Amino acid sequence: MGLELISVIVKDYDEAIAFFVDVLGCALEEDSASLDADNRPKRWVVVRPPGSGCGILLARARGEEQEALVGRQFAGRVGLFLRVEDFNASYRHMSAAGVEFLTDPRSEPYGRVAVFKDLYGNKWDLLGAA
């Protein structure tokens, strides 16, 4: 058993792909046409962080209820955790790309960590080795 995908609700597929691939360094694994439950066209977009067993399904918001949750999926808490091999290099790259970090890097018993927001405001932990 394993966790295959998590969903992140996005406003726009292409801007989300650009952020996850160009800024976070994820691989674009799939971007294909599909249909939703109401038989309306959509895209099936999956990105995956390097070395991760779990991918991220970029799900475009449909309707007011979903649009209101973009960037608020975790009710203001850190809800996503991105572990990287080289914390300092990733932090520098993301900072240079304009990512908003809410905390300075710090050391915790589980490693180096800094909290950042994705392009929609969801909070993430950037994690690295201690």
Positions of PLM-derived features:
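Core segments of cupin and vicinal oxygen chelate
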Residues: 7-54
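Helix N-cap motif at beta-to-alpha junctions
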Residues: 12-13, 85-88
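Short, charged/polar surface micro-motifs in flexible loops or helix N-caps
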Residues: 50-55, 62-66, 87-88
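Vicinal oxygen chelate
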Residues: 5-8, 43, 82, 91-130
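A short, polar/proline- and glycine-enriched secondary-structure boundary/capping micro-motif
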Residues: 67-71
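N-terminal beta-strand motif that seeds the catalytic metal site of vicinal oxygen chelate
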Residues: 1-17, 78-80, 130
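Short amphipathic alpha-helices within nucleic acid-binding modules
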Residues: 19, 88-93
